């Protein structure tokens, strides 16, 4: 094989490896057969990044997590340092494979908070947009049950993935289904 495919993107650019997020459970399973791959995953994005309304609990909450989850701040790397550590208001993650490499976690609550230096208006709108298209409201004042993209309805990688390159199909008409009435991917 001349070419070995590799994962590319933001996380790889930071120096992250798969094991930085996916621990033993996600890599080796729990000994039980699952009906789909996702059912064997212990961690979810909000476990480290939180939501637009709350900072992360820093414990696993995925389909394969136990009822109380695994506390991420209790995990130690081979060098003895904590894998995840709160330093003031900042959540730091240290690489499991590269000693000395660490990064600041981006927290959705800060991205959605206007007085924060991390505030991003486009991200805030995407995460908190109301389903009511007549008002086009967004922000923390929109209740979770009224949000178009609430974390109770959509997983983060619905939009945040290398294969989701545009809003076409969900929000914009596409030529692929031009014969259908809705013009959307179903």
Feature roles, as predicted:
Residues 1-16, 20, 24-158, 162-186:
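Primarily the internal scaffold of c-type cytochrome electron-transfer domains
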């Amino acid at each position: 094989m001349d070419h070995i495919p590799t994962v590319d993107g933001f996380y790889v650019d930071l120096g992250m490896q798969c094991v930085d997020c996916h621990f033993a459970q996600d890599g080796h399973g729990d000994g039980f057969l699952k009906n789909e791959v996702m059912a064997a995953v212990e961690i979810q994005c909000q476990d480290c990044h939180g939501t637009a309304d709350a900072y992360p609990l820093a414990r696993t909450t995925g389909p394969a997590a136990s009822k109380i989850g695994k506390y991420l701040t209790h995990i130690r790397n081979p060098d003895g340092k904590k894998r995840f550590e709160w330093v003031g208001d900042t959540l730091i993650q240290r690489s499991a494979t590269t000693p000395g490499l660490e990064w600041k976690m981006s927290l959705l609550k800060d991205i959605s908070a206007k007085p924060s230096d991390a505030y991003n208006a486009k991200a805030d709108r995407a995460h908190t947009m109301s389903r009511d298209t007549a008002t086009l409201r967004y922000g923390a004042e929109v209740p979770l049950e009224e949000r178009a993209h609430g974390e109770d309805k959509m997983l983060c990688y619905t939009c945040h993935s290398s294969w989701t390159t545009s809003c076409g199909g969900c929000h914009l008409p596409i030529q692929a289904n031009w014969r259908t009435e809705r013009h959307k991917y179903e």
